[in-house]
């Protein structure tokens, strides 16, 4: 797995025509390149499971309990802390490469009025984070979850835990 982070993201995007807002230097905005060996395209939802649960693990380590809001968000306390965007390149019936875009609100405390319900780690924990130190920690959490893709038992465990952490927000 490889990561490419942006200290300043100028054209962040989300699902559909949504954009991602991040003040330069305050948040983690990065993409992961993953080459899941032997993952069938029909099982590509497991890549969402991998990323979302890895991010959830990271947040739990920071004392933040979070859940998954389908299709691609991580929420805590009724507010959005992270967004995901996953694009897969297929080769036949298999996922050859996956690019997982992550936008995690880390130190941001001021938000544009048009953003609905954003929250950051700093707002929740009253602690400032060095994003350069936090990125490898978060990547290790996601990488550990990606390792579960290698076996049928790991894939089943990912799916079950993912399903158990879906938020039902009305």
Question: Which residues are covered by each model-predicted region?
Answer:
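Acidic (Asp/Glu) carboxylate-rich active-site/surface patches
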Residues: 51-93, 103
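Short, glycine/acidic-enriched loop or turn micro-motifs at the edges of active sites
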Residues: 10-11, 15, 76, 104-106
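N-terminal lobe of the biotin/lipoate ligase/transferase fold
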Residues: 1-61, 82, 128
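Conserved, helical-rich catalytic subdomain that frames metal- and/or nucleotide-binding sites
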Residues: 124-170
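Short, acidic (Asp/Glu-rich) active-site segment that either coordinates a divalent metal cofactor
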Residues: 93-125, 131
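Short beta-strand segments
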Residues: 5-7, 31-33, 69, 85-87, ...
């Amino acid at each position: 797995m490889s990561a490419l982070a942006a200290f300043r993201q100028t054209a962040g995007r989300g699902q559909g025509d949504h954009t991602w807002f991040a003040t330069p230097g305050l948040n983690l905005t990065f993409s992961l390149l993953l080459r899941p060996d032997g993952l069938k395209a029909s099982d590509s939802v497991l890549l969402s499971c991998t990323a979302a649960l890895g991010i959830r693990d990271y947040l739990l380590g920071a004392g933040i309990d979070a859940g998954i809001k389908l299709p691609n968000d991580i929420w805590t306390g009724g507010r959005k802390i992270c967004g995901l965007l996953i694009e897969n390149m297929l080769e036949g019936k298999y996922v050859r490469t996956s690019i997982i875009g992550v936008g995690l609100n880390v130190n941001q405390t001021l938000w544009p009025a048009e953003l609905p319900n954003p929250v950051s780690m700093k707002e929740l924990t009253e602690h400032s984070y060095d994003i350069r130190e936090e990125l490898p920690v978060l990547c290790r959490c996601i990488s550990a979850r990606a390792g579960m893709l290698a076996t049928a038992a790991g894939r089943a465990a990912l799916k079950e835990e993912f399903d158990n952490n879906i938020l039902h927000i009305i």
